[in-house]
Amino acid sequence: MGYISIDSSTSSTTIIVFDEKLKIKKKFQKEHKQIFTPEGYVEHDLNEIYQNLINLMRLASQLESNPKFISLTNQRETFALFDKETGRPVHNAIVWQCTRGQKYCDEIINNPSISNRITQKTGLKANSFFS
């Protein structure tokens, strides 16, 4: 019984199948599009990422149909909203590289009482990196 690792990164989805001694049996990878809008926004099509994941898992499951565990990692600060009823994405994922929230961060930075409170509670300064 082996293991499967899934990494949904900024540029692709990668699945690695390991044997029981953690030796790599096979690596599968599929890139997804980076959507750069004229406004400078950065997004990902969640349906494309989902379809890539399904297709890669089909390939991986031919090598390991009953893994002991599956590990998952993702892009961290990228975020998405899903419809509670349908489970479908409401919009593309907002990628960590996107700066659409920077004007709000600037407002916070220019207000020391709010800015200091955020830094005190989080240890971080307001930054669009954190979506």
Predicted regions: what they are:
Residues 81-131:
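Glycine-rich phosphate-binding loop and adjoining helix at the ATP-binding site
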Residues 1-91, 116, 120:
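N-terminal glycine/serine-rich phosphate-binding loop of ATP-dependent small-molecule kinases
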